[in-house]
């Protein structure tokens, strides 16, 4: 069904104002059908009108036509004879060709003229074309191409179509459609590339210019009543047409449809019916469309309609909606009535844009508007101004160039008409059709009344109407057609007494008849005779006669003027005509005289005389009547005195009338005012009732009417308070809900990690104990029996019993009786009676004494927070606040540093110092103490002073909120069961204390992502001033000045006795940090002082630090424990995006490890390295067992450590299923993890060789950077100062200390810790000082081979590698990372290689890297390499292959709880994918098939995966194919990264060299796969790195989120986002063999989470992937060329693809 059209819209935006009406032809006869006799050449300014009855064509100059009204001159026209009467004329699109179709002797011909030839004397057609072979066929439509002016299509009346391409020299090319096609109409497309044709039945077809069919649109059967034809069509836009359907038969009205034919989908029809209101006759139905695309208008002209329809579209798009417009009555195009009051119809219609005149409406001048010309069926040419008064209307007019008339044949149009009249002998038969073409012939747009004066100057049209007799002799100007104005004829300028005659085209009813034209042709008014104008005029065909004045006219009429009224807005111009007496010839131009001569005066003179006589008679009669009427009136008046009485009475009546009016008016006003007040009252009452209805509770309190304004105001205020309170309450509720949800999450996680003891466990245990007791008693009893037997004593006793049994039958009877009466309770009682009360009591006592053993992991009890450490932390926070008030000079330095952006190579990171949190403590990952042999333990019992980091809510960084102090037993740090699961163990990590901070623990920072909460370092007796926050310029801060040659030692300026002034501000200030992404905030050297700027991603002072590590403020204590105030360059480590874990002192060495050696250096940007973290090592002889004060309970996600009661050194029990301390920060992605705790927990540092430093006050002024075996947290201080060469001197040990640290102490990593985003500082557990070789200060690195050195790479910064013997320069957070000796994997994967930091300058190539990067040390990442050969629950065991790192998703290597047995080193089983071969549980892994060879999903023989074919894994052969990573893209060759360097990973570059490619979404992929660690040997540009300038040893694979690692050393540095071994630093997850075996989960880097994989072949713990191919879930998904399906998942290998950015992650690599 067709849709109904929208309703009509009344508008005044578009108006048609009649400009001029002239007679173009006379005697047009009956209206002809199927003709179009009007065409315009807008480019030449010519209008062509074909005669409906004569073989002629009139060419009219449009400019003259427009000016005719104002100049009172006839438009210039030329009469061009044609071979026969024209049927259809049309102008080409460029206006240069005119096609005329005419039928000559029955043959239809098409004559095409050059338009310019009409201005020359000789007019000849350029082309003469015969349209059809048969006769009596004419053209129905001439369709010129709108773009190609030489292309013309002709629709013929027999249904054929001819297409002509006109060539030079009169030639043409033709294509045609046969008449069998029955073409009814056509239209070109707006661009002229196709033509659309209408066919019977509503079919519409699109053809190309060569008439090849392009598209067919069939009309559905239910659109229009069949049968019907398509009689007109207009192509509006690409997919939209206007069509007119006409049903066959009589009395059928046409209907206009808008046809929407979208490219896809069925066409739709919208029915507008007939907007022209056509009649059914007198002609055949024919419609002409005129589309004005600039104004989105469509004009529709009907052959049988008296009105032009107009439609508008206001929408954009392919198929906009159209709406019919209804214009004002005076602004429409309506065909005028003929003289006989018959309807006239359009014979032609032309839209003309050649106009140049401008109209003024309401004193506002409009822009040039186009015109519309209509030729009516009675020969009149109507010209309308087409006004668009919208302010946004675009101009469509363009003035034509002037055309010179060289023909000499253009004459005033009225002369052409006169010559026609001569040819007509019977001209008198229709006098009314011979308009006298006087200059003021027809003025139709005058809005004025007739002027009552005879004047030759413009007369305004506002004069009063002439009095009854004043019109004599005055020329009446004509009023507009619709108006009836006294003395005027609407369509022609009437002639008053002596005025020249005018044409009477549309009669109006005259008022009194004076000076008006007759209403009817016959005597219609008092003085008119047969249509002639009243008083002396008669319709003449001779222009000259028109100016004759009858002699009988009134004397004043001798010089009449005929004013021609201007357009509506112009003043009325009266153009004077100079008349002379009748007998003299009028002084007119030559042409009129010629006309006079052509007429015979003898013929006309008598007629004129007769008519004048008649008029005079009539006039005299009329005067006589008037006189008589006057006399009759005078008779009633007696005397003049009577008049006075009448006058007085009239005055009285007038006054009375006025008074009555006033009174009535006042009454009305009062009544209205009262009514208005009542209405207001009613409205107010309604409002009140509505309010009461809406809020019924108010009515209980008060009557709404009783509220006075003040009460209302108060009520409104109270309501606003209520609303505000409600809003706050809602917010509070939301907050509480959020916290509750988080709490529930924690509870769920804790409950998962906790063993729930069945409720009957106690009973069971007691029963078993009793059973054991009874069995023991039985054994004793049996012993006694056996001894009795031996001695023969038992036999006699038994015999006695036998005798007693064989008693008399009486006994048997009693027995039966007792059986009958026996009850169970008696038996029980009798049995109980066997035990005396004393015995029962003893049993009870024994049972009660034996306590039920509840075996469960314990966690520190947080309830009450009464730990001294916490109270101390609070006190420090208060002190810091007080201290914050005093600006330290250091702050000034930092501020200065902040301003200049550091040079690109240094890395755009603002100078490190500036950050308020400048002291981002790189919490050195204190390796979890391993049981170590205490050597020379002098003060075994010295507890390390707990560093008290504040708790960070949800911190991804390493903040260790509560350092738990643990007493140190020199050798083993056993976790006592009680210690184990205390309240907040979260399954993934430590208890959460707090609210979600991604960054260092801002103590109370809500959701801070990075601020490092300052971990207050353990009090150290003589803190090194290096952390001189107060002393901004400690010597160490200017390390550059020292010549490398002079001393490779940093002299720590360290007053021994002076307590280090580690500002304690940081803690307090970080507490109120709000969500900052990079704890850059550091003002001054305050350790943790984070500015409170809300949520900045790294800008200075940004609170939302993604990685600020909590600054560990070393607590200075007098005691001689080694104090390490490691000065970390202020902004260094902490900026891990998920910042590094706090330093956690390692328990392992007898050497005191100072916990959190973070030197906060607020050095100016220029300092190459902030002073080395000089640990004032004076009293190095530390108790051999320093308990790591920050022994963080490892938590999968957090390295946050909590205050934990002393942990005995036994490190073997993993407290948490996923390990990692997270004891305090709920869900922190970065803190260090207590290795001992946790499935994924960091492994404790491999026993570091105990080195005892014997000198108590050994001041090592020149702190040689020998990595002492002290497992002091090597706080490698990275200075982000522009200097490219920061040498970080890490733990300075008294020189005397032996540096035999072999400890591969894994830095505690948390399973998910992301190493500091920006800081790549990680102190390897063994203090492996990284000395920058290139720095002038190259500190010697002693031989300590701390294998376990974890360098934590920072997400954005180079990995901070603590290279033991490597003299790799330490990179500042933003500088390129030094090569970390160990490749550390990051959850998002760091590239194990020296790389420039994302943001920073290149580090110089490490000079001494001892080993080429061996792929041996696959970095461990969350999902990457597992620890060495300890079975780990999730990691596959490694049997042998050194390099393979198994992955949670990836290849297995040694039997694991879940999984596949270790196989060849390459194969790693995947949790989800093919596992390796046989596993403890059968060869299939819980989640995946145990596949012997495939990395992540190679389908091993028979292994099946729970999820079907490795749902997430691609099966890959054991070949070193790519190790995929969830987020990683294959490594392989470096790929360009969107942000910069090469990797195509979105943020980073893939690592290139490693055979196994593991890409990371955030960083270059490398073989290691977890979330992104990747190893690579060749530099790949880092996403954030290369882009921002990386430079250093030329190789830097920067990773977006993963810190790059240098694979060269075998040591691994963990550091996901935060340098600390966050995720996997060896100690954290990997190092100490928590689960037995060396490493927690496996290799030493066991769940080395992010930290490096252990050099040994170990399945990559949670992190790094190993070389072997391991496809990764998402990577393989994305890598599939064929798209995702569960079928392909397992089948496709890691097609080696360099997948585009986002590292082949899923979603088809974002192809």
From Swiss-Prot:
Region (Interaction with emb): 1044-1711
Keyword Nucleus in annotation: yes
Name of the protein: Nuclear pore complex protein Nup214
Gene Ontology CC annotation, any one: nuclear envelope
Chain intervals with Polar residues compositional bias: 1251-1261, 1688-1698
Membrane topology, from the record: Peripheral membrane protein
Naturally occurring in which organism (per UniProt): Drosophila melanogaster (Fruit fly)
Domain free text: Contains FG repeats. FG repeats are interaction sites for karyopherins (importins, exportins) and form probably an affinity gradient, guiding the transport proteins unidirectionally with their cargo through the NPC. FG repeat regions are highly flexible and lack ordered secondary structure. The overall conservation of FG repeats regarding exact sequence, spacing, and repeat unit length is limited. FG-rich region is required for emb localization to the nuclear pore complex.
């Amino acid at each position: 069904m067709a849709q109904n059209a929208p309703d009509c819209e009344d508008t005044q935006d578009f108006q048609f104002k009649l400009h001029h009406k002239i007679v173009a032809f006379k005697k047009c006869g009956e209206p002809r059908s199927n003709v179009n006799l009007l065409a315009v050449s807008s480019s030449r300014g010519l209008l062509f009108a074909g005669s409906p009855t004569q073989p002629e064509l009139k060419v009219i100059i449009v400019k003259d036509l427009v000016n005719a009204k104002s100049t009172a001159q006839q438009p210039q026209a030329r009469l061009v004879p044609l071979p026969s009467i024209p049927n259809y004329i049309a102008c080409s699109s460029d206006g240069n060709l005119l096609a005329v179709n005419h039928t000559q002797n029955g043959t239809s011909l098409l004559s095409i003229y050059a338009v310019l030839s009409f201005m020359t004397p000789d007019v000849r057609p350029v082309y003469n074309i015969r349209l059809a072979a048969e006769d009596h066929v004419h053209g129905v439509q001439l369709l010129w191409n709108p773009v190609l002016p030489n292309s013309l299509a002709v629709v013929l009346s027999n249904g054929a179509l001819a297409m002509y391409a006109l060539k030079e020299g009169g030639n043409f090319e033709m294509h045609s459609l046969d008449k069998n096609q029955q073409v009814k109409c056509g239209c070109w497309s707006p661009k002229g590339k196709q033509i659309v044709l209408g066919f019977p039945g509503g079919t519409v077809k699109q053809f190309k210019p060569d008439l090849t069919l392009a598209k067919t649109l069939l009309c559905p059967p239910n659109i229009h009543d069949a049968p019907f034809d398509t009689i007109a069509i207009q192509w509006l836009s690409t997919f939209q047409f206007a069509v007119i359907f006409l049903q066959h038969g009589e009395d059928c009205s046409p209907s206009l449809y808008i046809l929407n034919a979208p490219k896809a989908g069925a066409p739709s029809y919208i029915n507008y019916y007939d907007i022209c209101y056509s009649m059914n006759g007198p002609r055949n139905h024919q419609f002409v469309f005129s589309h004005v695309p600039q104004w989105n208008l469509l004009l529709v002209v009907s052959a049988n309609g008296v009105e032009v329809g107009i439609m508008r579209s206001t929408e954009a798009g392919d198929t906009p909606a159209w709406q019919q417009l209804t214009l004002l009555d005076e602004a429409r195009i309506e065909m005028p009535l003929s003289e006989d009051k018959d309807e006239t119809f359009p014979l032609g219609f032309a839209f003309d844009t050649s106009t140049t005149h401008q109209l003024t409406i309401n004193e506002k001048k409009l822009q040039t508007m186009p015109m519309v010309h209509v030729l009516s069926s009675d020969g009149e040419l109507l010209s309308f101004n087409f006004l668009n008064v919208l302010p946004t209307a675009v101009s469509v007019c363009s003035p034509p160039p002037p055309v010179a008339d060289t023909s000499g044949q253009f004459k005033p149009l009225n002369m052409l008409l006169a010559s026609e009249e001569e040819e007509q002998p019977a001209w008198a038969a229709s006098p009314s059709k011979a308009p006298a073409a006087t200059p003021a012939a027809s003025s139709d747009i005058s809005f004025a009344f007739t002027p009552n004066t005879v004047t030759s100057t413009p007369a305004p049209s506002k004069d009063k109407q002439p009095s009854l007799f004043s019109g004599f002799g005055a020329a009446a100007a004509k009023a507009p057609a619709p108006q009836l104005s006294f003395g005027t004829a609407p369509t022609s300028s009437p002639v008053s007494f002596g005025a020249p005659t005018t044409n009477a085209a549309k009669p109006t009813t005259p008022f009194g008849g004076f000076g008006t034209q007759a209403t009817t042709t016959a005597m219609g008014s008092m003085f008119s005779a047969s249509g002639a104008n009243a008083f002396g005029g008669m319709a003449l065909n001779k222009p000259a006669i028109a100016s004759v004045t009858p002699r009988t006219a009134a004397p004043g009429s001798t010089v009449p003027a005929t004013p021609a009224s201007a357009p509506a807005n112009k003043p009325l111009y009266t153009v004077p005509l100079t008349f002379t007496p009748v007998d003299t010839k009028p002084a007119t131009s030559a042409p009129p005289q010629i006309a006079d001569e052509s007429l015979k005066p003898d013929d006309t003179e008598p007629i004129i005389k007769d008519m004048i006589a008649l008029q005079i008679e009539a006039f005299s009669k009329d005067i006589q009547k008037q006189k008589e009427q006057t006399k009759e009136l005078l008779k009633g008046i007696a005397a003049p005195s009577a008049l006075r009485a009448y006058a007085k009475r009239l005055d009285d009546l007038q006054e009375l009338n006025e008074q009555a009016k006033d009174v009535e008016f006042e009454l009305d006003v009062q009544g209205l005012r009262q009514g208005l007040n009542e209405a207001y009252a009613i409205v107010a009452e309604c409002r009140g009732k509505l309010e009461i209805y809406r809020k019924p509770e108010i009515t209980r309190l008060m009557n709404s009417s009783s509220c006075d304004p003040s009460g209302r105001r108060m009520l409104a205020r109270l309501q606003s308070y209520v609303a505000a309170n409600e809003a706050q309450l809602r917010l509070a509720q939301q907050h509480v809900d959020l916290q509750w949800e988080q709490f529930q999450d924690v509870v769920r996680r804790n409950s998962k990690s906790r063993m729930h003891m069945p409720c009957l466990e106690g009973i069971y245990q007691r029963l078993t104990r009793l059973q054991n007791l009874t069995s023991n008693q039985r054994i004793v009893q049996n012993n006694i029996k056996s001894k009795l037997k031996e001695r023969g004593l038992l036999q006699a006793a038994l015999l006695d019993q036998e005798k007693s049994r064989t008693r008399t039958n009486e006994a048997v009877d009693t027995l039966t009786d007792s059986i009958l009466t026996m009850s169970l309770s008696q038996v029980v009682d009798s049995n109980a009676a066997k035990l005396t009360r004393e015995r029962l009591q003893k049993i009870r006592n024994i049972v009660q004494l034996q306590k039920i053993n509840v075996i469960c992991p314990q966690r520190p009890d947080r309830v009450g927070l009464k730990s001294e450490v916490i109270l101390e932390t609070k006190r420090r926070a208060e002190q810091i606040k007080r201290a914050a008030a005093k600006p330290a000079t250091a702050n000034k330095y930092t501020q200065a540093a902040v301003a200049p952006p550091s040079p690109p190579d240094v890395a755009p990171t603002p100078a490190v110092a500036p950050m308020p949190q400048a002291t981002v403590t790189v919490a050195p990952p204190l390796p979890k103490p391993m049981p170590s042999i205490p050597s020379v333990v002098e003060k075994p019992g010295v507890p390390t002073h707990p560093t008290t980091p504040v708790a960070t809510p949800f911190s991804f960084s390493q903040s260790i909120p509560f350092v738990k102090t643990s007493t140190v037993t020199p050798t083993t740090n056993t976790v006592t069961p009680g210690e184990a699961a205390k309240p907040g163990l979260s399954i993934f990590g430590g208890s959460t204390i707090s609210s979600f901070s991604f960054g260092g623990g801002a103590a109370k920072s809500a959701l801070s992502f990075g601020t490092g909460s300052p971990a207050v370092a353990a009090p150290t007796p003589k803190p090194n001033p290096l952390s001189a926050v107060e002393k901004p310029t400690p010597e160490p801060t200017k390390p550059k000045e020292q010549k490398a040659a002079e001393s490779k030692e940093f002299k720590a300026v360290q007053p021994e006795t002076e307590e280090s002034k580690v500002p304690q501000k940081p803690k307090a200030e970080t507490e109120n940090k709000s969500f900052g992404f990079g704890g850059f905030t550091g003002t001054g050297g305050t350790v943790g002082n984070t500015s409170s700027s809300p949520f900045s991603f790294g800008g200075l002072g940004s609170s939302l630090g993604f990685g600020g590590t909590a600054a560990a403020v070393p607590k200075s204590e007098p005691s001689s424990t080694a104090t390490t105030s490691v000065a970390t360059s202020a902004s260094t480590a902490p900026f891990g995006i998920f910042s590094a874990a706090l330093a956690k002192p390692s328990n392992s060495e007898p050497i005191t490890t100072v916990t959190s050696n973070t030197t906060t250096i607020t050095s100016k940007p220029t300092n190459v390295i902030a002073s080395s973290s000089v640990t004032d090592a004076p009293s190095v002889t530390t108790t051999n067992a320093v308990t790591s004060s920050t022994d963080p309970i490892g938590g999968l996600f957090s390295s946050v450590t909590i205050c934990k009661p002393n942990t005995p050194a036994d490190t073997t029990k993993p407290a948490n299923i996923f390990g990692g301390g997270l004891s305090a920060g709920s869900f922190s992605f970065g803190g260090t993890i207590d290795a001992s705790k946790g499935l994924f927990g960091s492994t404790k540092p491999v026993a570091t060789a105990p080195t005892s430093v014997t000198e108590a006050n050994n001041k090592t002024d020149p702190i040689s950077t020998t990595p002492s075996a002290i497992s002091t947290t090597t706080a490698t201080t990275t200075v982000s100062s522009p200097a490219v060469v920061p040498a970080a001197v890490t733990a300075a040990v008294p020189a005397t200390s032996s540096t035999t640290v072999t400890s591969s102490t894994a830095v505690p990593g948390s399973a998910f810790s992301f190493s500091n985003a920006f800081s790549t500082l990680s102190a390897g557990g063994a203090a492996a000082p990284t000395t920058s070789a290139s720095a002038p200060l190259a500190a010697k690195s002693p031989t300590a081979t701390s294998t376990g050195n974890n360098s934590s790479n920072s997400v954005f910064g180079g990995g901070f590698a603590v290279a033991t013997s490597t003299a790799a320069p330490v990179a500042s957070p933003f500088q390129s990372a030094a090569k970390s000796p160990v490749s550390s994997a990051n959850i998002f994967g760091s590239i194990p290689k020296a790389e420039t930091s994302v943001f920073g300058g290149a580090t110089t190539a490490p000079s001494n890297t001892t080993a080429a990067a061996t792929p041996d040390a696959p970095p461990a990442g969350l999902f990457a390499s597992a620890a060495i050969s300890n079975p780990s629950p999730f990691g596959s065991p490694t049997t042998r292959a050194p390099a393979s790192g198994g992955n949670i998703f990836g290849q297995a290597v040694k039997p694991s709880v879940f999984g596949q047995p270790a196989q060849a080193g390459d194969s790693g089983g995947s949790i989800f994918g093919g596992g390796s071969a046989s596993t403890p549980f059968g060869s299939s892994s819980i989640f995946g098939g145990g596949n012997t060879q495939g990395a992540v999903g190679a389908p091993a023989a028979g292994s099946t995966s729970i999820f079907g074919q490795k749902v997430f894994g691609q099966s890959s052969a054991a070949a070193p194919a790519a190790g995929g990573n969830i987020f990683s893209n294959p490594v392989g060759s470096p790929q360009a990264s969107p942000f910069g360097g090469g990797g195509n990973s979105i943020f980073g570059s893939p690592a290139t060299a490693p055979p196994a490619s593991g890409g990371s979404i955030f960083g270059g992929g490398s073989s290691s796969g977890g979330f992104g660690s990747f190893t690579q040997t060749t530099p790949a540009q880092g996403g954030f790195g290369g882009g921002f300038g990386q430079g250093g040893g030329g190789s830097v694979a920067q990773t977006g989120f993963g810190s790059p690692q240098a694979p060269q050393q075998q040591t691994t540095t963990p550091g996901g986002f935060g340098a600390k071994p966050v995720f996997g630093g060896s100690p954290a997850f990997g190092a100490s063999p928590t689960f037995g075996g060396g490493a927690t989960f496996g290799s030493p880097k066991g769940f080395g989470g992010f930290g490096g994989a252990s050099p040994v072949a170990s399945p990559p713990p949670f992190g790094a992937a190993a070389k072997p191919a391991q496809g990764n879930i998402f990577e393989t998904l994305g890598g599939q060329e064929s798209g995702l399906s569960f079928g392909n998942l397992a089948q496709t290998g890691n097609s080696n693809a360099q997948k585009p950015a986002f590292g082949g992650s899923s979603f088809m690599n974002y192809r």
